[in-house]
UniProtKB/Swiss-Prot annotation:
Gene designation per UniProt: adk
Any Pfam family hit: ADK_lid
Stretch list, region NMP: 30-59
Recorded superkingdom: Bacteria
Protein's name according to its UniProt entry: Adenylate kinase
Domain notes: Consists of three domains, a large central CORE domain and two small peripheral domains, NMPbind and LID, which undergo movements during catalysis. The LID domain closes over the site of phosphoryl transfer upon ATP binding. Assembling and dissambling the active center during each catalytic cycle provides an effective means to prevent ATP hydrolysis.
Residues that, per the record, bind ATP: G10, A11, G12, K13, G14, T15, R123, V132, Y133, Q200
Length: 214
């Protein structure tokens, strides 16, 4: 079972990815982890990627496709895999298809921007322990204070509203077009496309996922 997971940052992809991995025994492949592993292992592609990253440049699509092909040929991918954070653009999706990497299911977790802003900009963290709160969904007993130590809570830079909106803008510009792209691939009978309402409870989304990923 080869799966691509699509959705904006903060849509809940990570939680559902965990569910899919545990339920179906397939690894989650993230390009970041894959790059780090290849660099650490010193593979030819890893060394090439390291050179590019050390120069502060972006790793090319060709190089990443090479790494994906290398990674999915490993034993733990026999039953399939879950691609996370790749492809991000239509050229990357085209390159995957050109390299014969077929996909069985494309899953989109759809959450409106304003809901994502509410979710992410409401997060508060206790820097000392990493405990995470949310002003709406999981508030601390005393506003702005950690339940255990009473110390101040902080907002991670990634969760600042302006940062969240910027990341959403990039998602809509680069990755959202993949929704239409894979819709066409599915219409041609070459994959299955499923869209889920990510504003539902985690359990509800997981149950719906399980019903289509039989």
């Amino acid at each position: 079972m080869r799966i691509i997971l699509l959705g904006a940052p903060g849509a809940g992809k990570g939680t559902q990815a965990q569910f899919i991995m545990e339920q179906y025994g397939i690894p989650q492949i993230s390009t970041g982890d894959m790059l780090r592993a290849a660099v650490k292992a010193g593979t030819p592609l890893g060394l090439e990627a390291k050179k590019v990253m050390d120069a502060g440049q972006l790793v090319s699509d060709d190089l990443i496709i090479g790494l994906v092909k290398e990674r999915i040929a490993q034993d733990d991918c026999v039953k399939g895999f879950l691609l996370d954070g790749f492809p991000r653009t239509i050229p990357q999706a085209d390159a995957m298809a050109a390299n014969g990497i077929s996909i069985d299911h494309v899953i989109e977790i759809d959450v409106p921007d304003e809901e994502i802003v509410k979710r992410m900009s409401g997060r508060r963290v206790h820097p000392g322990s990493g405990r995470v709160y949310h002003v709406v969904f999981n508030p601390p007993k005393v506003e702005g204070k950690d339940d255990v130590t009473g110390e101040d809570l902080a907002i991670r830079p990634d969760d600042e509203e302006a940062t969240v909106r910027k990341r959403l803008g990039i998602y809509h510009e680069q990755t959202k077009p993949l929704v239409e792209y894979y819709g066409k691939v599915a219409a041609a009978g070459n994959t299955q496309y499923h869209k889920f309402d990510g504003t539902q409870s985690v359990a509800a989304v997981s149950a719906q996922l399980a019903s289509v990923l039989k």
